[in-house]
């Protein structure tokens, strides 16, 4: 076995060209004082725009609409809104017709910090001008997560959204795999990550002209900054969708991370969460097909470095996941970065 570079090194290399880029984009958006974390900002073309209002004259929100056409999936990544930006968050939920919000809470004691709780309790109705937010139900699930159902009303418009609060996955920890799998099962059973875009709604959205970003019907993935955990979750979901869809030659984890960074600066920057991507996908592979247990050792070893050559990789496993495309070599990575990243000026 020959190791070329360690995973943590490649994560830092991918971020090397981001600080200057983030400063340039932040300055362009004139959003320094509106972002909780200045460096975590959306690339301009992927920034969700809201309908301007008296409280938000240019319709800005720190949220990225990320689209992966190969898989036919979109996601909105954003951070936890500060108290004075909660109205903008719920406005985005309504305007984007997002069916689901997945919030990764920072408090592992199953209690929300004050700034994490941006929604009403049962029986309460929060009003933001003509927009009202009401909680309808609440449930605690095995797997360390809670669900809430909210209904949003604005004039004649009504929109329902399912909200997940996920505990046990913080900036410095990863979730227990059993809990993560329980979460994914509920999401799969409820269709939580599927974009809700009935033909009639999609037709109306294409026929109308919008002041804001047209409805994407995309789930909202939310962590404190909308970067590391949210980005890692998106990559895991994409990879599992690819595996289930039997897509070939697309299993490059690094490629997906670079694409995420192209749409949201400093997305998936933490090596710990980078590692969890591999652990979650490998665990899914092994559970999905029990015969892969015979290949568990080489798969785990492969996932623990950025590139590993095996003298005798079994052809059966190679046929299924095509491991040589999981990583881009340095030359390919640099070429890819040049093609997707705008030049720093």
Swiss-Prot record:
What is the recorded phenotype of mutating residue 175 to L? In ut163; moderate increase in constitutive dauer larva formation at 25 degrees Celsius. Constitutive larva dauer formation is further increased in absence of cholesterol
Say if the entry is tagged with keyword Cell membrane: yes
Q: Name one GO cellular component term.
A: cytoplasm
Tissues with expression: Expressed in the 2 embryonic head hypodermal cells XXXL/R.
Which SUPFAM superfamilies does the UniProt record give? (Phosphotyrosine protein) phosphatases II
The UniProt entry lists the main location of this chain as: cytoplasm
Q: Which family does it belong to?
A: Belongs to the protein-tyrosine phosphatase family.
- Task performed by this protein: Together with eak-4 and phosphatase eak-6, negatively regulates dauer larva formation downstream of insulin-like receptor daf-2 and in parallel of age-1, pdk-1 and akt-1.
The protein depicted here goes by the name Protein sdf-9
Q: Which gene encodes it?
A: sdf-9
